[in-house]
């Protein structure tokens, strides 16, 4: 998933694919940026699937630092929904049984 924020107060991501399915442990994690979507931005601005949204987010996050959460089976990551975040690439072993699967839960106040 590319860089985006979500229309929620709290996000919970849970990775459910076993570690033995991972080809490259330097990938498959989650990047959580230190910047959050500004309150005046619309959902389309911070979660749009178009070039205008992409360029706006790219410019806003230009010098932003992020934390990288490494992939780990059965790991839950809890963070603020308006924090920009993205999948840290994906490189799993070949085969349907090795696909990276996660559940994402979005919670309001």
What are these regions (language model features)?
Residues 1-109:
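Catalytic core of non-heme Fe(II) oxygenases with the double-stranded beta-helix
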């Amino acid at each position: 998933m590319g860089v985006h924020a979500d229309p929620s107060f709290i996000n919970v991501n849970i990775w459910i694919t076993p570690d033995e399915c991972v080809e490259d442990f330097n990938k498959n994690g989650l990047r959580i940026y230190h910047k959050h979507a500004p309150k005046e931005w619309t959902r389309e601005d911070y979660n749009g699937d178009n070039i205008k949204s992409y360029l706006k987010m790219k410019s806003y996050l230009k010098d932003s630092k992020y934390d990288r959460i490494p992939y780990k089976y059965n790991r839950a990551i809890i963070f603020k929904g308006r924090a920009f975040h993205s999948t840290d690439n994906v490189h799993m072993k070949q085969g349907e049984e090795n696909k990276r699967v996660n559940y994402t839960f979005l919670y309001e106040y």
